[in-house]
C-alpha cells in the first residue's frame, strides 16, 4: 500500500493530492470488491466512509482529479463470474453520505437552490431507515417475477433469481389492477438479529466459520450457487425504490411505497413524509432511539425528495442522485483496553475466546466483555490466512492506517488498545486494534490446545472436503468433559436417542450437580436411595430459594401420601432406565453425540457394522489408512475437485511428465491449469505434488466409510477424531458393559413406500414430525426436508408453505395427513 500524507486536505500540495488520490481510489476500489463482490469486508463502514470523504475532499479542492481514479464514480463491484450477468435497464446507483445535522440543512438548501424554490414553497422529503443488507433488483413482467439481480457495479449485476424465489417475503406474483406490465422493484435483502444468531449457532455447531454480521450473512446466503442453501436461511426483504417501469403507479416516493404495499411487497413501516429540516431530524432521532429494538440492522436514515417530477429535474452527479442522501448514524463504538483473554467451553466443546475489557460505555451501555469469535479472529486472519484487520490511526476517527507496516500484525493481545463495536442486542465485539498504542511487552496470545474444563486435547479438525482446518477449536473430551457433560447427557436420554422416559432437563441437572451421573454409563448404575436423596435435596433447595424470595416460610414436610407418590416416581425413573438395557444400534450411535453424526448417519453406520466393537475397529482401521495432505489438498484446490484429481493421478502414474500439456490423460481446462500453477509454481512443481498425492492415497478401510454417500469424508474424520481419544473409548466401553445393542429390523417391504422419497410439511395434528418420519422410514421410505423432481410424495398439513409450491412446480403428488395415515394402515 502506497504511503499517503495524513495532513488535512487544505494543506497538501497538488503533487501530494495526485498521489493521495491515486492511492485512495485504488484502495476504495479494492474495498468495494471485497464488500460487494466477496461479502468479506476487512474494514468497518465508518473507516470506509472516512476514506470516501477524504477522496471527495481532495476532488473538491483539486477538481481536475475528479473522475480520474478507480473509485470516483464507481458503485459496488464487478459482478462475479460465478453467476450469469444481468444488465440493469436503469442503473443501481449509490447515495451520498452525511453525518452531521448541518449537512442535512445544506442538502435541503442545495436542492432548493438547484430547483429555484422560493422560501415560501415547502419541499416534501421522505425519510426511511437505511437497511444494512444487500441491494436487490426484482423485475416483474405481467405481474410475474422473471429476474432478480444484485447491484454488482451498478450497471451489471448477478442473476440470483433461483435463490430469490426461496425468500418468502418476495412474491412470485404482484397483486392489484394497477401493477405495471414492466415493474422493476429495488430493495434490500437482510437478516433479522434473531435469525442471524440462529444461523451462527448452526455454523458453530457444524464447525464452520461464523458470519461477522447480519449483512455478511445475508449477502453470503443470497449469493450461493446452491439455492437450497439460500432456502435454509430465512432472508427478508424491504422494497423502497423503482427501476424500469412501463407505467408509474404514483407520482411521488411516498405514493410508490403505498403502491408497493398494495402490490403485496413488504415495505418498511418507519417510512414517513417530512416538510422541513426539523421534521427530518426529528424522525432521524426517533429511529436512532428505536434502533436497538427494531430487530434488524440499520445504519442511518435515507432522505429522498418526494416528487418524482422534482427528482427528474435534479438528476445525478457522479455516482449518486442529487435528490437523495443517507444520514448515517454514528458508530456505536468506543476505545478501551483488553485486560485479559479468557476461554469459555461451549456445550458442544467449542473453545470460545472472550476479551475482558476495562469497562467502557458503548451506545449507552457499559461493556466489560467482548467476543473474539475464534482462534483465527484473535490472530487477525480469516480461514484462508488473509488479514481481517488493518490497524487504525486515531487522527481521522478510526480510518484505515496508511503508515503502518502490517507485517507487525493486527492480532489481538492482552494490553492492546482496541475498538469495540456494539449493534443492538448483539454481543459486543473487538473490531480493530490501535497498533500505535500496543505496549512494548505485549506478546501474541497463545490459544490453548488443552481444554480448560477437563484437560483433554483441544483440536481444530481438518476438513478433508475443503482441505482446511475448521475455524473452531474443540475439546475432544466429549463424554467426560464437565463443560459439555449436561448437554451430552440431555442428548443421550432424548427422544431420538435412547429415549429414556422421565429424564428431562431438570432430572439430568439434579443428578449431574449431585455427582451421581457424569457420563452415560452412570445412568445404568443408579440405585433407589442415592437417587431419592438427590431429588429430595434438590426439591428442598428450590423450596428454600422460593421462600427466601417471597418472604414466606418453606413448605411443610411431605405427607405419607406425597412421599409414596415421590417413591413411585423414582421407581418409574429406574424402570425407564432398565427398559433401555437393549437398544437399536443406530440409536446407540446417535446417542453418543459424535460431531457430524446425526440420525441419518447413525442409521448408515448401523448398516455398515453389526455392533459397536465392529464399528470401533472399522474406525481404527480407517484412521490407519487416512489420505495424506497432498492427496486431500489437490482436490481442495479451486476448480480442481476429486474427479480431476483422479485424472491427474492417472496421468502421473502413466508416466506423463508435463501434466499441463494438451492431450494428456488429465484433460485440464485453462482455469484448472491456472489454479494448479498458482498452488505449485511450475509444471514440475505440479507433477511433484501429484506424485506425492499418488503415494498418499487412502486405503480401502478409509474409503469404505469416506466414499459412502451417506457417511462421507467429513463424518469419517469426525469418527476418527472421537475414537482416537482414549477417554471416549473408555466411556463407550463402560456403557457397553451396561447396555446391549441390536441391529434394527430391516424396513418392511411395502411396495407403496419402498425406495420412495417423502416430504412432510405444515402442521401435523395426529402425530409428531418425529413419529411421521419414523413410520415412513420403517416402511422403507426416505424422508427429505425439501421438495425436488426426485420427490415422490408430499404430506401437507395446515400452514404448508413454499414446499407446496415446489410440489406443484415439480408435479409431485400432494396428500393430507389423513390420507397418509390411511396409506400407512393399508401397508
UniProtKB/Swiss-Prot annotation:
Gene Ontology biological process terms, A to Z: DNA repair; DNA replication
Protein name per UniProt: DNA ligase
Annotated catalytic residues: 130
Function per UniProt: DNA ligase that catalyzes the formation of phosphodiester linkages between 5'-phosphoryl and 3'-hydroxyl groups in double-stranded DNA using NAD as a coenzyme and as the energy source for the reaction. It is essential for DNA replication and repair of damaged DNA.
Organism: Methylobacterium sp. (strain 4-46)
CC terms in the record's Gene Ontology section: cytosol
Molecular-function annotations in GO: DNA binding; DNA ligase (NAD+) activity; metal ion binding
Family from the record: Belongs to the NAD-dependent DNA ligase family. LigA subfamily.
Cofactor(s), by name: Mg(2+); Mn(2+)
UniProt binding sites for Zn(2+): 451, 454, 475, 481
E.C. number: 6.5.1.2
PROSITE patterns: BRCT, DNA_LIGASE_N1, DNA_LIGASE_N2
Enzyme class: ligase
UniProtKB keywords: DNA damage, DNA repair, DNA replication, Ligase, Magnesium, Manganese, Metal-binding, NAD, Zinc
NCBIfam families, per the entry: dnlj, PRK07956.1
Pfam families, alphabetized: BRCT, DNA_ligase_aden, DNA_ligase_OB, HHH_2
Occurrences of domain BRCT (ranges): 748-827
Catalytic activity: NAD(+) + (deoxyribonucleotide)n-3'-hydroxyl + 5'-phospho-(deoxyribonucleotide)m = (deoxyribonucleotide)n+m + AMP + beta-nicotinamide D-nucleotide
Binding annotation for NAD(+): 45-49, 94-95, 128, 151, 188, 304, 328
